[in-house]
Amino acid sequence: MFRKILSVLNPTVFVLSLCFQIILIYTIIRHSPKNLSTLKAILLTNCCFQLLQSSMVFFTQIQLVNHLVPIELWSYGPCRHFEAFMCYSMFHILQTSSLVSGLTVFLTTFMKYQAARHVRPSKKKNCFVILFISSIVLISAGCGILLVIIQALPLEIREKYYRINLELDEYSVIGIVDYSVLPSRVNGIIINGLVVIVPITCLLLRRKILKLLTASSDALYFQNRVFLQGLTLQIFGHTLVYVPIFICSTISLITKTEYTFAQFFIFVLPHLTTVIDPLLTMYFVTPYRKRLMVWLRLKNDKVHSVSPSTFAVSANH
C-alpha cells in the first residue's frame, strides 16, 4: 500500500519542489532589496540544498530497514538500476542536504532574534556561528565520504551487491548503516541529535522574539506580525515532519520492531519541506509577496519603498 502511495507522492512532490524552488531562486536574485543581503544569502543556500535534497529523495526513494542488524538501505527509485555504490553515495548526499536545510532554519531564526534585540552581531560572532554550522556539515559530509569509500567502493562489496540485486526486481539493496563503524556512529549522533536540538532551540528563540515584540509598541508588533507568523509556520512545519518520524525510527532501531510507515516515510516527510518552505518564503517575506502579487495581477507593478523595521537582517517581514 505504501509503495502505491509513494509511486504518486514522490514524483509529485519532486516536480512541485523543482517549480517552486526555481521560482523562489529567481525572485531572490532579481527582487531582493539591498537591506536583505544577509537573508538573501541564507535563502539561496537553503534553496540550493533543498533542490539537492528533493532530487536525491526522488532518485533514491529509500526504505530504511532499521529492524535488521545492520540496518539495510533499499532503493525503489530510478537509481536502483545503477550500481549500488552510486545510490549509496546519493543517500549520503541526501543526509547532508537535509542537514543543511535544517541548520539554515536555525541560522535564520538566530539572526532574526538578534535583530529583534536591536543587536547587530559583530563580524567575529557572525564568523563563529557560521564556522560552527559549517564544521558540523563538514564533519557529517566527511563521515559520509569515508563510509562510501569503506562500505561501497571496494570491488568485493560491489560484486556482493551486484549478485544480491540480480535476484531483485522491485527494489535494490544499496548499502547498510552500521553503527559499530565509527564514521557511521558519528554521523548518526550528529543527525539524530540535531533533529531534536534544532527544533527545540528554534522554538525557544521564537518565544524570546515574541516576548521582545510584545514588550515593544503596538505599531512595531503590528509591523512584524507577518514575519512572526511565517517564522512560526516554518519552525512548526520542520518540527512536525522531522521529530515524530525520527522518534518512531529510533524506537524501531532499539526494539528491533518493524514499523513499515517509518521505514518508507523517514525521508519522504522531510521532503515536503522543500515544497512548503518556498511557499512560506514567497508569502511571508514582504518584497517577495509584493512581487508575487504583481505576477498574479493583484497589484500594480511599481516601485515600493522599504519600510523601516526592527529586523535589520530581514527588513519588513
From Swiss-Prot:
Transmembrane segments: 5-25, 90-110, 130-150, 185-205, 235-255, 264-284
Keyword Nucleotide-binding belongs to the record: no
InterPro entries reported in the protein's UniProt record: 7TM_GPCR_serpentine_rcpt_Srd (IPR019421), Nematode_rcpt-like_delta (IPR050920)
KW Zinc (keyword) present: no
Organism superkingdom: Eukaryota
UniProt entry keywords in alphabetical sequence: Membrane, Transmembrane, Transmembrane helix
Main location: membrane
Membrane topology summary: Multi-pass membrane protein
GO-annotated cellular components: membrane
Gene3D superfamilies in the record: Rhodopsin 7-helix transmembrane proteins
Pfam families: 7TM_GPCR_Srd
Localisation per UniProt entry: Membrane
Family recorded in the similarity comment: Belongs to the nematode receptor-like protein srd family.
Descriptive protein name: Serpentine receptor class delta-44
The species this protein was found in: Caenorhabditis elegans
